[in-house]
């Protein structure tokens, strides 16, 4: 019997705000000492009252609009009650039946080039919990720094049928979250966490199978691995006549397996009811229109425009449109250099600049202070005018990257201007011909590509400063003269 997989994802994204979801407490806890980013609200002291973080509301709406969600006129916070050491109040303020975003979609591109729509059921705001630090078998410690940090949970429809689709969906969603400045995208620090709900059913059966939730996946690679394992595990259970239990399982990366953690709760177990200390939020249509006007051009739209407007390759367009900082940098330089120079601008950024950034472990923001739009435009201009060749241009670029000096200053200081004097290059051509009689013989016997070797010899002798077109013409003239 063949089985069909059904996969839905719940993505928990910490929202980038200065303060926490319901108080003015510092939300930048990542490198802070344990329990140093807390206040009365964070740890649920009696008598404290929550105040909604407006920036978290704004960013949640931005993401919802980017995912083509509806933004209801009213949304409401509720209490989700459960007892756990990392939840000091014994309830979490979240959204239950009135979330801020509903009925969206995200389009992913599959490995075969086809696209697939994945529905977004909802996205709702809540406060994050604290973190447990497990010691030996006798105790665990609780760090409440994370408690109260704004969290946006994005719940997909169960539209995915393969682990690859789940990975592509999560990767695409992360790209949009980071592009909008809603989330840092850091899975290792827990700023972005993904839970998967997965089931299988006999092929052709409409009714879904029993759902299993998988947690503890700290990378998209592990998400895919965990789903592959879990699908195989469930299929094996059914083939052996067993029954799938509705439960929560954790991914063990070292062992490459999922392990049972607890039976899966139902909604009524949490005793949801409206948060009495917070009134419903009214999101006027004017406010939503203002948020829509804030939306930048998203990666997919940029990618398509870079192809049509600038004629870039798909690879370059993808590299340049994927991150907002990179896209803004590229477009700023194109605005200076002109649309006609978009391709050379793209080549320099995706080639030499990315290589040097990777080697130097710097950020683009740091490098952009040295490789300015004016400097890169100037470099493209001197290459186009034939003042320097491509080999020397890379030397100039590296020096510009290192020092921030202008290309003209570097060329003049190092004497790198291209040699186009025919008398000088004619002599260099004669020297190359004299030093390579076998290559000359090959050329004269009809192996015309052999001249490229001679061009290379002249370029080496002139340290890359010779004009290759002039060199080739000089070589042809001298070779023809010796017939």
Swiss-Prot record:
<dbReference type="GO" id="GO:0006412">
    <property type="term" value="P:translation"/>
</dbReference>
<comment type="subunit">
    <text>Heterotrimer of A, B and C subunits.</text>
</comment>
<dbReference type="InterPro" id="IPR023168">
    <property type="entry name" value="GatB_Yqey_C_2"/>
</dbReference>
<dbReference type="InterPro" id="IPR004413">
    <property type="entry name" value="GatB"/>
</dbReference>
<dbReference type="GO" id="GO:0050567">
    <property type="term" value="F:glutaminyl-tRNA synthase (glutamine-hydrolyzing) activity"/>
</dbReference>
<dbReference type="InterPro" id="IPR017959">
    <property type="entry name" value="Asn/Gln-tRNA_amidoTrfase_suB/E"/>
</dbReference>
<keyword id="KW-0436">Ligase</keyword>
<protein>
    <recommendedName>
        <fullName>Aspartyl/glutamyl-tRNA(Asn/Gln) amidotransferase subunit B</fullName>
        <ecNumber>6.3.5.-</ecNumber>
    </recommendedName>
</protein>
<dbReference type="GO" id="GO:0050566">
    <property type="term" value="F:asparaginyl-tRNA synthase (glutamine-hydrolyzing) activity"/>
</dbReference>
<keyword id="KW-0067">ATP-binding</keyword>
<dbReference type="Pfam" id="PF02934">
    <property type="entry name" value="GatB_N"/>
</dbReference>
<dbReference type="InterPro" id="IPR003789">
    <property type="entry name" value="Asn/Gln_tRNA_amidoTrase-B-like"/>
</dbReference>
<dbReference type="GO" id="GO:0005524">
    <property type="term" value="F:ATP binding"/>
</dbReference>
<comment type="function">
    <text>Allows the formation of correctly charged Asn-tRNA(Asn) or Gln-tRNA(Gln) through the transamidation of misacylated Asp-tRNA(Asn) or Glu-tRNA(Gln) in organisms which lack either or both of asparaginyl-tRNA or glutaminyl-tRNA synthetases. The reaction takes place in the presence of glutamine and ATP through an activated phospho-Asp-tRNA(Asn) or phospho-Glu-tRNA(Gln).</text>
</comment>
<dbReference type="InterPro" id="IPR014746">
    <property type="entry name" value="Gln_synth/guanido_kin_cat_dom"/>
</dbReference>
<comment type="similarity">
    <text>Belongs to the GatB/GatE family. GatB subfamily.</text>
</comment>
<keyword id="KW-0648">Protein biosynthesis</keyword>
<dbReference type="InterPro" id="IPR006075">
    <property type="entry name" value="Asn/Gln-tRNA_Trfase_suB/E_cat"/>
</dbReference>
<dbReference type="InterPro" id="IPR042114">
    <property type="entry name" value="GatB_C_1"/>
</dbReference>
<keyword id="KW-0547">Nucleotide-binding</keyword>
<dbReference type="GO" id="GO:0070681">
    <property type="term" value="P:glutaminyl-tRNAGln biosynthesis via transamidation"/>
</dbReference>
<dbReference type="InterPro" id="IPR018027">
    <property type="entry name" value="Asn/Gln_amidotransferase"/>
</dbReference>
<dbReference type="InterPro" id="IPR017958">
    <property type="entry name" value="Gln-tRNA_amidoTrfase_suB_CS"/>
</dbReference>
<dbReference type="Pfam" id="PF02637">
    <property type="entry name" value="GatB_Yqey"/>
</dbReference>
């Amino acid at each position: 019997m063949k089985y069909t997989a059904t996969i839905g994802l719940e993505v928990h994204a910490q929202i980038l705000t200065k303060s926490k979801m319901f108080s003015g407490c510092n939300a930048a806890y990542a490198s802070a000492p344990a329990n140093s980013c807390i206040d009365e609200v964070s740890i649920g002291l009696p008598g404290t009252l929550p105040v909604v973080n407006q920036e978290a509301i704004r960013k949640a709406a931005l993401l919802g609009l980017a995912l083509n969600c509806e933004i209801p006129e009213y949304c409401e916070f509720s209490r989700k009650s459960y007892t756990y050491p990392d939840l000091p109040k014994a309830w979490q303020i979240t959204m239950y039946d009135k979330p801020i975003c509903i009925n969206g979609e995200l389009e992913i591109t599959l490995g075969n080039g086809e696209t697939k729509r994945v529905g977004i059921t909802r996205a709702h705001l809540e406060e994050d919990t604290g973190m447990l630090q497990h010691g030996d078998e006798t105790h665990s410690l609780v760090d409440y720094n994370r408690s109260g940090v704004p969290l946006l949970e994005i719940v997909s429809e169960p539209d995915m049928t393969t682990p690859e689709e789940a990975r592509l969906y999560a990767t695409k969603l992360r790209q949009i979250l980071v592009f909008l400045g809603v989330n840092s995208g850091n899975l290792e620090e827990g700023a972005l966490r993904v839970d998967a709900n997965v089931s299988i059913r006999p092929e052709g059966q409409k009714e879904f199978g029993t759902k299993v939730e998988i947690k503890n996946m700290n990378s998209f690679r592990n998400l895919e691995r965990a789903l592959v394992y879990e699908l195989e595990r469930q299929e094996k259970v059914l083939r052996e006549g067993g029954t799938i239990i509705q439960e929560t399982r954790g991914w063990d990366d070292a062992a490459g397996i999922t392990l049972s953690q607890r039976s899966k709760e139902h909604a009524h177990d949490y005793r949801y009811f409206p948060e009495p200390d917070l009134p419903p939020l009214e999101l006027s249509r004017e406010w939503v229109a203002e948020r829509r006007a804030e939306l930048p051009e998203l990666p997919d739209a940029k990618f398509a425009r870079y192809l049509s407007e600038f004629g870039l390759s798909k690879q370059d367009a993808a590299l340049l449109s994927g991150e907002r900082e990179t896209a803004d940098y590229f477009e700023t330089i194109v605005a200076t250099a002109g649309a006609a120079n978009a391709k050379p601008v793209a080549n320099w950024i995706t080639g030499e600049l990315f290589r040097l950034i990777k080697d130097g472990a710097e950020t683009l923001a740091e490098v952009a202070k040295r490789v300015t739009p004016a400097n890169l435009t100037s470099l493209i201009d001197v290459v186009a005018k034939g003042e320097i060749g491509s080999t020397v241009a890379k030397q100039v670029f590296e020096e510009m990257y290192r020092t921030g000096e202008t290309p003209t200053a570097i060329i003049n200081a190092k004497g790198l201007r291209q040699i186009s004097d025919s008398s000088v290059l004619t002599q260099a051509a004669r020297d190359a011909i004299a030093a390579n009689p076998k290559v000359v013989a090959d050329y004269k016997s009809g192996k015309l590509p052999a001249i490229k070797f001679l061009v290379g010899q002249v370029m080496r002798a002139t340290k890359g400063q010779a004009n290759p077109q002039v060199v080739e013409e000089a070589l042809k003239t001298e070779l023809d003269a010796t017939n």
